[in-house]
């Protein structure tokens, strides 16, 4: 069983991948810093959810 993410997290993550192609990697810590830099996410919890989802998408693309 996996984690279910809200449509907000999915939408923001996909938009960030499209607007910044090639910047995100399959490393969570790197993506966490990039999400903080590129977005105006207000909470650490939400930032980590978005970074984790981006990491998962990038890992599946490889």
Curated annotation (Swiss-Prot):
GO cellular component: cytosol; ribonucleoprotein complex; ribosome
Record PROSITE patterns: RIBOSOMAL_S17E
Keywords of the record: Ribonucleoprotein, Ribosomal protein
Top-level lineage group: Archaea
The protein, known as: Small ribosomal subunit protein eS17
GO biological process: translation
First and last residue of the signal peptide: none
Family: Belongs to the eukaryotic ribosomal protein eS17 family.
Species whose genome carries this gene: Methanothermobacter thermautotrophicus (strain ATCC 29096 / DSM 1053 / JCM 10044 / NBRC 100330 / Delta H)
Any GO molecular function: structural constituent of ribosome
Pfam families in the record: Ribosomal_S17e (PF00833)
SUPFAM superfamilies: Rps17e-like (SSF116820)
């Amino acid at each position: 069983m996996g984690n279910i993410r809200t449509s907000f997290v999915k939408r923001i993550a996909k938009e960030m991948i499209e607007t910044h192609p090639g910047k995100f990697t399959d490393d969570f810590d790197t993506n966490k810093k990039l999400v903080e830099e590129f977005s105006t996410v207000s909470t650490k919890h939400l930032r980590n959810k978005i970074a984790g989802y981006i990491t998962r998408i990038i890992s599946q693309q490889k």
